[in-house]
């Protein structure tokens, strides 16, 4: 249990409070037991440790054959054995009850103790843990609730053969007192355990959602260049190889890094991302490798860097081309033997971490210019993946635009269902210097500006409208303009035919085979147009 989970327990108060219940010889026998149990509870913040000792005291001093403590999981509405003596591990596993089921379930349901003078003859006896109704032993079984603020938290039960019925009554009273004494500890355990289980379940749910989200098949885009990227992700994800992701800003390099990690054997471990671009040299070292207490002004405590945080998982170094020569040198060592020292420290720190790096810079040119270490480049460039710019993924623009429209419609409480043909033409003819990130921003703006269920051309920013109207905004060559017009005509024909290649070819006056060749050249897939049916 955490240090914050504490409670006040007055040993003398409990002993004095319960002392009136016993007289004479019984009092002499029972009060030392109560006092001993109260000391056990006071000195143990851990429920399992405390219960184990309490049950041991019951077994030693009360000659009980079996002792059982159950806890009530209100979320699952089940009662389970938390600790016991006289039961095997297999028997403990079988001790799971619903509320109202068997003697234990009835005690939790009613909040009242049950005494079975002859256990095997009691109508609620289930025999789930050991004994059967046909057994010869005439053991009594008594089960009392563990309660706190009128809420049943669990039960404590015992089994023993009694020759004197008066002793049974005294033991039931004693067990009731023990239940009262352990109730605060049980309550704190349940509160913390429920929260821990909730967080664990939430963590599992989020990790599963991330794994589903970052499946290569869930990345939007069916163009040939992206199919090649998916194939590379599939091949490298299951390995421990260092990956270098190349591509312009906004193409989705971080998405590729996520897909690799969440489809790897280390998917359950951490993925730690560090953006190297905005960090000055001294902060970059501390960010990546951590620092020791007092290593510089303001270093009041030891700090673990990204590499230590990612131990057992993956670190994603975004914009790795921006690192200073000093940090580059330290990174070479990490790549070589997975060891480093924190800033201000001399003790080597060893980590087991997979490295994925990304950059929009031309590292080969930087190596030639002497601004990027050659040995670092070759250690990073084990398995390069180049993410194509959006202008080379013609058919993906429509699929991505539709995805963003749906997402931003939900986010903004709108009901935008489609993009008009003129608006689609503008999206297809634009060269997207900001790539997918720019398209995302454009579609968010368009959804916000839309007054009905359609994205119109006038909902798009002026830069797209100007480019479509003039056809010269990009400074394209004649050949590039001809290709753009040809691509636009093919897209329009496929939209009109709902992706049917034969009908589109007929509309364009081309043979089906020739249209297929041109579609492959421009990376256009007929599947992207089936929604127009």
Curated annotation (Swiss-Prot):
Query: Which Pfam families does the entry mention?
Result: GAF, HTH_8, Sigma54_activat
Under the heading InterPro entries, the entry gives: AAA+_ATPase, GAF, GAF-like_dom_sf, Homeodomain-like_sf, HTH_Fis, P-loop_NTPase, Sigma_54_int, Sigma_54_int_dom_ATP-bd_1
Q: Give the domain of life.
A: Bacteria
User: Which part of the chain is the GAF domain?
Assistant: 46-186
Task: Give me the positions annotated for DNA binding.
Answer: 501-520
GO MF annotation terms: ATP binding; ATP hydrolysis activity; sequence-specific DNA binding
Every Sigma-54 factor interaction domain range: 219-448
* Record-listed ATP binding positions: 247-254, 310-319
What the protein does comes down to: AnfA is essential for nitrogen fixation under Mo- and V-deficient conditions. It is required for the regulation of nitrogenase 3 transcription. Interacts with sigma-54.
Record key words, sorted: Activator, ATP-binding, DNA-binding, Nitrogen fixation, Nucleotide-binding, Transcription, Transcription regulation, Two-component regulatory system
Q: What is this protein called?
A: Nitrogen fixation protein AnfA
The region called A domain is annotated at 33-193
Which GO biological process categories is it annotated with? nitrogen fixation; phosphorelay signal transduction system; regulation of DNA-templated transcription
